[in-house]
Amino acid sequence: MRASGAVLTLLLATWGTSAAEPDENDSYFPIWGDEARARGYSIPLPYGVNLSYMNIRQDIMVDSITFSGLKLGNHPIPSDMFAIDAGHTREKSKTENLRLDMWVFPFLNVYGLVGHTRGSSVSQVSVDSDPSQFRGLDRAIAGAVHQLYQSGKLQDIDFKLDFKGTTWGAGFTLAGGYGNWFGLVDTNYTRTDFDILDGSISAVTVSPRVGYRFSFQGIDGPSHLSLWVGSMYQDVQQEFKGDLADLHMPPELQPLIAAVNKDGEGKFDVKQKLTSPWNMLIGAQYEVTKNFNVLTEFGFNDRNSFFVSGEYRF
């Protein structure tokens, strides 16, 4: 599952050359900004406040699902009793972020962000057990589970996890351009800590983009529309832990879990990652005024995403 993460953080540089667009600014930043303007480059105002929304739907690979702390009466059940196999898993998440950024150099922007992520994933799971691996009462329990599996009652069950939490992170953008063409590479680290469940989502994202900037007369002087294509790489590690009693168990699993978790001390641990780290991007940014712009971006292939933001620069 991803929230965040993932959490896309995009800053489109309005890099490009301009014949005669003096961009006076009293700020010390960006360093070497006056030199860049003297060479004919139009660069963004140094500071930015950005509000964004992102919606993601993507396929997930579940590495493991384990249950622990279970008992039948006073008899503890081994944590490896249940062999849980997860098939197709689909995750969806929504994230709202507030980002503050600054151009340190004309080619380098740094930023920090904080936000909120909520989402869910649905996995098709099958639960089995191997009686030959156990003795005594454990063998009898494993045999009963195996019979339920063979009957089909514990196969292809929809197992849903809901999550929400606070997302925070930081990153930087390298940007440059020639004529009206521009390129940038955005790199960031984000982490989502859950409000109810234990565990977290950590993501490292690298997004190269290349595009073209169109100039025209806007509502408040010269304006620009930028279009680009790119790709996104994400290295996401997701782990969900907590009490089994907090999960909304599917009807097929409720009798089994109720029998072995009467004291409510049962725990679960789910580890998973993305099936494909790469996806393609297309996007656009419209400079409404010198100080305000809006941006949207779509992702497709194995990860489908929609991103929209509004930004004030000063």
Predicted feature residues:
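Short glycine/proline- and aromatic-enriched beta-strand/turn motifs that initiate or cap beta-hairpins
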Residues: 19-92, 101-102
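Residues that define the transmembrane beta-barrel architecture of outer-membrane proteins
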Residues: 45, 92-96, 162-168, 200-206, ...
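Short loop/turn motifs that connect adjacent beta-strands in outer-membrane beta-barrel proteins
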Residues: 21, 37-45, 102-107, 176-183, ...
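Outer membrane beta-barrel transmembrane domains
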Residues: 228-314
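Residues on the lipid-exposed face of transmembrane beta-strands in outer-membrane beta-barrel proteins
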Residues: 51, 98-106, 112, 170-176, ...
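Extracellular loop and loop/strand-boundary signature of outer-membrane beta-barrel proteins
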Residues: 36, 82-86, 153-160, 193-199, ...
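Transmembrane beta-strands of outer-membrane beta-barrel pores
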Residues: 53-59, 114-120, 176-180, 187-193, ...
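Transmembrane beta-strands of outer-membrane beta-barrel proteins
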Residues: 47-52, 106, 110-112, 181-187, ...
